[in-house]
């Protein structure tokens, strides 16, 4: 299996926590995932945390962030974002209903602020005690791909707050180009 296949399969299995809500995973199903951790999942979380640390140590922070953003973009491509092309309000409503995500859209400034619900990180591969905050660049890439699909033009995305750095919520900002 090559790297692309691995990433595609991993994202298809729900690796990107941001995608779970958009894909319509009900709250009850997500809540059940917070029970006893399967040893395989615990091992995967450990390995992902180590992998991110190794990549961060072997590259520049910018290169590592870029790799993780690409991972997030691939995850977003596997979702059902196409149904929201030209319909950002529909996307906002679906994410709010399915994931508890809040959106603030300043049409004049061309910015969208995304505030993920409080609580533990939604990514099933995150071990909050081990995973470096660099991992959050995956979510930045997801947001870039999502909003480029929705608005049909390039966007810039940035992470403002992260649960992995101690914030209560993850907050991202998207700027339309």
Language model features with spans:
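Short Pro/Gly-enriched beta-strand edge/turn motifs at strand-loop
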Residues: 85, 153-156
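A general secondary-structure signal for short beta-strands and their flanking turns/coil
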Residues: 109, 152, 167-169
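C-terminal segment of N-terminal export signals and the immediately downstream linker at the start
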Residues: 22-56, 75
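Amphipathic interaction/junction segments at domain boundaries or subunit interfaces
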Residues: 55-135
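Short terminal or interdomain "cap/linker" segment that borders an active site or interface and mediates
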Residues: 10, 156-177
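Bacterial N-terminal signal peptides
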Residues: 16-21
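Active-site helix/loop of acyl-thioester processing domains in fatty-acid/polyketide metabolism
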Residues: 134-152
């Amino acid at each position: 299996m090559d790297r692309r296949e691995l990433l595609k399969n991993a994202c298809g299995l729900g690796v990107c926590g941001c995608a779970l809500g958009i894909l319509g995973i009900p709250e009850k199903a997500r809540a059940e995932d917070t029970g006893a951790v399967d040893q395989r999942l615990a091992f995967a979380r450990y390995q992902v945390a180590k992998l991110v640390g190794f990549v961060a140590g072997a590259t520049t922070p910018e290169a590592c962030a870029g790799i993780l953003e690409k991972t997030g973009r691939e995850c977003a491509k596997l979702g059902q974002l196409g149904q929201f092309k030209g319909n950002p309000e529909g996307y906002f409503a679906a994410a709010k209903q399915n994931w508890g995500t809040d959106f603030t859209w300043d049409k004049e400034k061309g910015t969208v602020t995304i505030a993920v619900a409080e609580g533990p990180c939604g990514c099933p591969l995150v071990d909050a005690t081990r995973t470096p905050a660099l991992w959050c660049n995956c979510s930045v890439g997801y947001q870039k791909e999502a909003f480029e699909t929705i608005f049909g033009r390039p966007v810039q995305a940035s992470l403002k707050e992260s649960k992995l750095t101690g914030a209560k919520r993850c907050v991202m900002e998207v700027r339309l180009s």
